[in-house]
Design a protein with these regions (language model features):
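A charged helix-plus-loop insertion that forms the helical arch/lid used to bind
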Residues: 64-79, 134-140
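Intrinsic-disorder/low-complexity, polar/charged segments
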Residues: 20, 27, 78-81, 135-136, ...
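Glycine-rich, proline-tolerant flexible connector loops at the mouths of alpha/beta enzymes
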Residues: 46-68, 78, 83-90, 173-192, ...
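A short acidic, glycine/proline-enriched capping/turn motif at secondary-structure boundaries
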Residues: 53-56, 71-72, 121-123
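N-terminal basic, low-complexity leaders that serve as flexible interaction/assembly modules and, when applicable
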Residues: 1-59, 66, 201, 284, ...
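Short, basic, glycine/proline-bearing loop/turn elements
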Residues: 12-25, 79-90, 231
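Active-site loop segments of alpha/beta catalytic cores
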Residues: 1-2, 7, 89, 93-320
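Short capping/connector residues at structural and topological boundaries
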Residues: 12-16, 65, 69-71, 268, ...
Length: 320
């Protein structure tokens, strides 16, 4: 999950100087600086590069803006224009993401991992066609009604996700995470085509060329279908949201699969004892298998840094 953000004063100082969010992500020195802020504050075990999953639609030529209290707003998209993209053209538009990784790797403790990431095909498809967050008034049938166009678009998205991931690895990312943030919007009939198979193809392609790079998948909202996702996609690590069934995971998912996350970020906004209790719940539930403690989503903007610090202490104490 993104570690840097509005809950940190030092982040706000840098954010105010940036023209817009995409420019911020493409200012490699600023992106690197905010990537390292949570590491300096909390001494976390890994850093995740400060960027955004919508860098890919931006790199393909679609306008991407972020409106206050609304989230991302994307411009119109043209399949013919998307098809004109090649690797060189795409990389030239987003090259500063890779510069940020190189810059961060030099400054980051060698013992700490640097995580690169991308959105999964389905999630990027949703943003490209819906042109905004699908939280409200999302119509699945409308999005996928033009099967031929959707299939063509998915192929393009997949191709450039791989290009983007490979370039991050070449630049110094030693772990990759795929965010399928809107996997939960799919019904059972469409899961295989739009979620399982595209993620499987990307994971397989990365592992074939970079077998030592761990891959984390975050299929948010799958819940009952999370076992099938793991069986088909075969990620090294499964990242879970706060509604995931931990008993189902322990029972049905191989103990070789690392589990990450789970804690609802809202616990960081409330009582320390309640947060501590819930954190220990996950740590105890997954103590007999490889587990990376993390949140089930990004840090809320209203979180106090002291709450994060306390949570880190709770986890460290449990580990020892």
């Amino acid at each position: 999950m993104r570690q840097a953000g509005r809950y940190l004063k030092e982040y706000q100082v840098i954010r105010k100087k940036q023209k817009n969010f995409i420019d911020f992500c493409l200012n490699y020195k600023a992106a690197s600086k905010v990537t390292l802020q949570p590491i300096k504050r909390f001494d976390l075990d890994a850093a995740i590069i400060f960027s955004d999953i919508l860098i890919i639609p931006y790199g393909l030529g679609q306008k991407v803006n972020f409106k206050h209290n609304e989230g991302p707003i994307l411009g119109s998209y043209n399949l013919k224009e998307f098809k004109k993209n090649n690797k060189q053209k795409f990389l030239s538009k987003v090259r500063n993401v890779y510069k940020a990784i190189q810059y961060t790797r030099k400054k980051l403790d060698k013992k700490k991992s640097l995580i690169g990431f991308a959105g999964s095909p389905w999630t990027l498809l949703v943003y490209i066609l819906n042109k905004k967050s699908p939280k409200k008034n999302f119509n699945l049938n409308k999005i996928i009604q033009n099967k031929k166009e959707v299939d063509s678009l998915l192929k393009i998205i997949e191709k450039f996700i791989y290009i983007h991931i490979e370039q991050q690895i070449k630049s110094g990312a030693d772990t990759i995470q795929l965010f399928d943030s809107w996997a939960g919007l799919l019904n059972k009939k469409n899961l295989n085509k739009y979620c399982y198979q595209p993620n499987k193809r990307i994971v397989k392609k990365i592992k074939q060329k970079y077998p030592n790079i761990p891959i984390i998948c975050f299929p948010k909202g799958l819940h009952k279908n999370i076992v099938q996702f793991c069986n088909i996609v075969k990620p090294d690590c499964l990242s879970i949201d706060s509604k995931a069934d931990v008993n189902l995971i322990n029972k049905k998912i191989s103990s070789k699969t690392i589990i990450q996350g789970g804690l609802d970020p809202k616990f960081l906004l409330g009582n320390k004892k309640a947060c501590e209790k819930k954190a220990l719940f996950y740590l105890r539930k997954f103590k007999h298998r490889p587990y990376i403690f993390n949140l089930g989503h990004g840090v809320d903007k209203n979180t106090k840094p002291t709450a994060v610090q306390h949570l880190v202490k709770v986890v460290r104490k449990f580990q020892s």
